[in-house]
Amino acid sequence: MPGTRPTGPKVKLSNGRTVNNFASYNFFNFVSNELLKDRAVQVLRNYGVGACGPPNFYGTQDVHMDTERDIAKFLGVPACIIYAQAFSTISSVIPAFSKRGDIIVADKAVNFAIQKGLQISRSTIRWYEHNDMEDLERVLEQVKKDMARKPLTRRFIVTEGLFENTGDIVDLPAIVS
């Protein structure tokens, strides 16, 4: 019966053609891996479905701290932090690095989590048209003029590598230049 089995990284179309399925979070076909399923059941029995709270209150478990230590060691850094979901990560990283008085120039097509992070940061936000490098340059020039009258402040450009809302890819070399 169609639609009753887990989708994998590849799907067969009605015309017989096999294509990559980028509309699924099952990119690596973990859903069909019996070893991972068994391990997931063991973890659920030991820890339940989630910590249900912020890390410093009652949301941290030994497996979280072990994983953070392992990742930090792998990266060769003193420490790291992991989040339970991508939205939390995205929306909290921006305000962690920026603050009131900073200027952030952002692509108008960034996803909702990035928009929330920009809002939470309380920085001044200037928008440029989606993937429009000429408009980005125009906005940056205006920021430069505005900053001539104000004390030194930090500036950031915020974009996505692969835009969640449009599927477009950013021209990162153009932004960096």
Spans of model-derived segments:
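N-terminal "arm"/small-domain region of PLP-dependent enzymes with the aminotransferase-like
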Residues: 1-49
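Active-site phosphate-binding strand-loop segment of PLP-dependent enzymes
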Residues: 126, 131-177
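Substrate-binding/gating loop at the entrance of the active-site cleft, primarily
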Residues: 85, 106-122
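Conserved N-terminal alpha-helix of the aminotransferase class I/II PLP-enzyme fold
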Residues: 38-85
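Short glycine/serine/threonine-rich phosphate/pyrophosphate-binding segments
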Residues: 82-93, 112-114, 165-168
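Short, small-residue-enriched loops and turns at beta-alpha junctions
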Residues: 29-30, 57-61, 112, 133-134, ...
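Conserved PLP-anchoring active-site segment centered on the Schiff-base-forming lysine
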Residues: 93-112
